[in-house]
């Protein structure tokens, strides 16, 4: 299975600049409706969708590009969470609280300039193996 990541934005050039600076991504192919960004383990497609347009034919929700909650967001694994946060802030992200530490690593919760949630994760020690249940049995 291949994974493609689509991110709705209302300002394509601003989004290209943000994701290029914050995540080190580069433009691959360009389309009438957006661009492909390369440099992550999966391609990311920035899709131009105007604010206020219907998000889905099955929903009355409208697109908005201020901070919003969604159950799906990007977690980006980085070598240095502090450096990654600095780059993202410089590019226009918002840090939502302190960088948190746990025995598995550190996490910074952020929002991109379009209100989408984004986390930076720096694994330490054995990463998520530090908190995995023995024998992978259900709790």
Stretch-by-stretch model annotation:
Residues 1-4, 26-75, 83-111, 122-139:
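Vicinal oxygen chelate
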Residues 15-20, 88, 115:
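Conserved active-site tyrosine of GNAT-family acetyltransferases
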Residues 117-120:
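Short glycine-/small-residue motifs
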């Amino acid at each position: 299975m291949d994974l493609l990541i689509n991110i709705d934005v209302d300002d394509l050039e601003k989004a290209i600049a943000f994701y290029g600076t914050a995540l080190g991504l580069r433009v691959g192919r360009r389309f009438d409706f957006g661009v492909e960004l390369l440099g992550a383990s999966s391609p990311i497609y920035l899709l131009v969708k105007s604010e206020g347009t219907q998000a889905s034919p099955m929903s009355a929700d409208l697109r908005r590009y201020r901070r919003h909650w969604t159950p799906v967001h990007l977690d980006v694994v980085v070598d240095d969470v502090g450096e990654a946060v600095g780059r993202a802030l410089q590019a226009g992200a918002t840090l939502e609280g302190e960088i948190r530490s746990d025995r598995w690593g550190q996490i910074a919760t952020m929002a991109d300039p379009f209100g989408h949630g984004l986390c930076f994760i720096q694994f330490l020690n054995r990463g998520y193996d530090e908190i995995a249940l023995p024998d992978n049995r259900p709790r």
